[in-house]
Amino acid sequence: MSIILSLETSCDESAAALVSNEKGKIDLLANEIASQIDEHANWGGVVPEIASRRHLENLPFLIEEVFAKSKLQIKDIDAVAATVTPGLAGSLLVGSITARTLANLHQIPFLGIHHLEGHLSSIYLSEKHPKPPFLVLLVSGGHTELIKVDVKHKYQRLGRSHDDAAGEAFDKVARLLGLSYPGGPAIQKIAKSGDPKKFLFPKGRVSKPEGGFYPYDFSFSGLKTAVFRQIEKIRSENKKLPIEDIAASFEYIVAEVLVERSFKCALDQGLNSLVLVGGVAANVRLREMMLAKASENSIDITLAPMEFCTDNAAMIGAAALLRLSSESFKSSMELGVSARWPLEKSDLLYDPIPPF
């Protein structure tokens, strides 16, 4: 049995977890998260300097807590893992330096994990999970991507957003409506009492230079502009702003676009298994529409467990265990952090000569 201490500090969630792998089954032994949402809400978004300071304060206590809850000690750990990319550089450094220090001190391997690989691995924390190949819709505050996972667990990006990620669009539209941060939960809450068909907002497409559109790509900046113009139009007519209807219509069109392009991609690629992960995967309307579409098309669907949709260290531990079980992967102690790094190049995080 392998046991990993995993850390996540890529943005505004400080997290630590202890995860084990026995006979191919991943078990969560302890999982702790310290959220900074309330503090960043005062600023309408994440303030990088505040985020990194809070990670410094929170992480030692979270590590202490997971060991106390699991009744394990550091001598029981086989490796330490931390998110090293992508994310806020200052925040990533806190987790990375902590993990490398512990690994060096106790002479155990260190694994630098790609944050998106962590999200992809969140499905292995559920009782039932698919076997590759499958298509993943990864949708969060910073990313909206369609990723094919092949039988060797190699990644191929087939679709992406060319501007705002879906979660970012939720935050921006929430701000236009005067709602709190983060925008996803705020919009979902008031959308429940709105009419999702009241306003017909556009489905953004990305044009090819030679004509036509990229079939699996996304664009949400035009949708945000359409919502802004609708709000301005209503206000210019001195009418009461139907916030619930606007929120519901916006939420519906985002979910519809994500569902339509995901299933088109899966069917075109001959994949009969689809996976939904990431922070926006917690959206109830999106989950319901994904399940309904999967039933229509006889495609197997796996939704990330609700508690592991947003950033957490358990998914980072799951990703690290998969790396350890597939080959004897470990990262160089010289591996740093990077605000951006393509998922397709995540294998390079385990090279003797680190990429950054």
UniProtKB/Swiss-Prot annotation:
Known SUPFAM superfamilies for this protein? Answer: Actin-like ATPase domain (SSF53067)
- Keywords in UniProt for this one? Acyltransferase, Cytoplasm, Iron, Metal-binding, Transferase, tRNA processing
Q: Which family does it belong to?
A: Belongs to the KAE1 / TsaD family.
Give EC number(s), comma-separated: 2.3.1.234
PANTHER family membership: TRNA N6-ADENOSINE THREONYLCARBAMOYLTRANSFERASE, TRNA N6-ADENOSINE THREONYLCARBAMOYLTRANSFERASE, MITOCHONDRIAL
The domain of life is Bacteria
Q: Which purpose does this protein serve, as stated in its record? A: Required for the formation of a threonylcarbamoyl group on adenosine at position 37 (t(6)A37) in tRNAs that read codons beginning with adenine. Is involved in the transfer of the threonylcarbamoyl moiety of threonylcarbamoyl-AMP (TC-AMP) to the N6 group of A37, together with TsaE and TsaB. TsaD likely plays a direct catalytic role in this reaction.
Q: Where located?
A: Cytoplasm
Q: Does the keyword tRNA processing apply?
A: yes
What does the entry list as the binding residues for substrate?
138-142, 171, 184, 283
Tell me the organism.
Prochlorococcus marinus (strain NATL2A)
Q: Which CDD domains match?
A: ASKHA_NBD_TsaD_bac
Q: What is this protein called?
A: tRNA N6-adenosine threonylcarbamoyltransferase
Kindly give the InterPro entries that the UniProt entry links to this protein. Answer: ATPase_NBD (IPR043129), Gcp-like_dom (IPR000905), KAE1/TsaD (IPR017861), Peptidase_M22_CS (IPR017860), TsaD (IPR022450)
